[in-house]
């Protein structure tokens, strides 16, 4: 039975569990839920809400999108082995009152204290608008006072959606402002707190996430069959949640992700696009507390026995994955003589460098004290190692010309600031010349 929304106000505590469900015929009478969600609701995770003997039963308070609260039974099938968990008595009435249909998606979240909030997505994969949400104003730019009611859509990641993913036509029509339809770049805020720039493609079939989308999925361990839920924050900025094949929310914080996040927090220097001088006695990167050191990608040498193969020394890279994304490299003898510079795979993958391409390096040159400036650019070939690490290399075709034109010497430090995957601004910190 529905009740007053204020009745749920006493529930406190952070969200404990989330689950996504697709409504099947059996879901309208009794909706199955995950063991994790059931354990929270039934007090089996140490919150003191567990029952006594027999199969545990407990009523959850389900808050509908229109602000009403429904009492719904939570229980397990009594089959002698714990049984499957479900939302039972009261759920059928909730489903009927909200007009839920076959193939709809339901996202439930436990807010604590037995209170469940519900989001409903119809067969267009867009958040269902009941038109009666209290105290919420939502605009085409996606701004809303209540974050849960901002425009949202979800997609099941079928194999064809890994390379590029179509944004639902209904979502584009209702929630993408007209002035944004000709913008070719969106931003996604990952669960790790980093913004990723994703290229937008538009054709007669609609609007798609494309350039950088596959790299975003790969970096976060998002796989075919997962479901992505994107919430529009406005101005083509999206927040994302991911659910696994079992419907449970995925934790995307891998070991590598945490390392990168910690590295980014320790970077206090924002690179500029000017050429500066540095003390020749100072060591590269000593102004940065967290230096990342990588082994350069292997350079194929002669296989003839007894012939020495010349290999680069280990070089230090300090980088941040953004935006803005940037990486610093100290110029070595090897880079100048062999015309090859190696960049770490994690950095390359994060900006979308996953295949052979050409990168434009650009330097801005200011003219004296005036505000006028000019820019020069060089095209440099880039290869990507297919050895699993994804290291990329700026090749002699273009890199040597760049070094010669800018008079680079051993000890100089180049900061490459990524504007787009294949367009980088370069700032040069020159070692003092004797």
UniProtKB/Swiss-Prot annotation:
GO cellular component, one term: nucleus
A single MF term (Gene Ontology): DNA binding
Database matches in InterPro entries: B3_DNA-bd, DNA-bd_pseudobarrel_sf, REM_fam
DNA-binding region: 27-124, 150-246, 326-432
Keywords: DNA-binding, Nucleus, Repeat, Transcription, Transcription regulation
A Pfam short name: B3
Residue ranges crossing the lipid bilayer per the database entry: none
Keyword Endoplasmic reticulum attributed: no
Main location: nucleus
SUPFAM superfamilies in the record: DNA-binding pseudobarrel domain
Localization terms from the record: Nucleus
PANTHER family: B3 DOMAIN-CONTAINING PROTEIN REM-LIKE 3-RELATED, B3 DOMAIN-CONTAINING PROTEIN REM14-RELATED
Protein name: Putative B3 domain-containing protein Os04g0347400
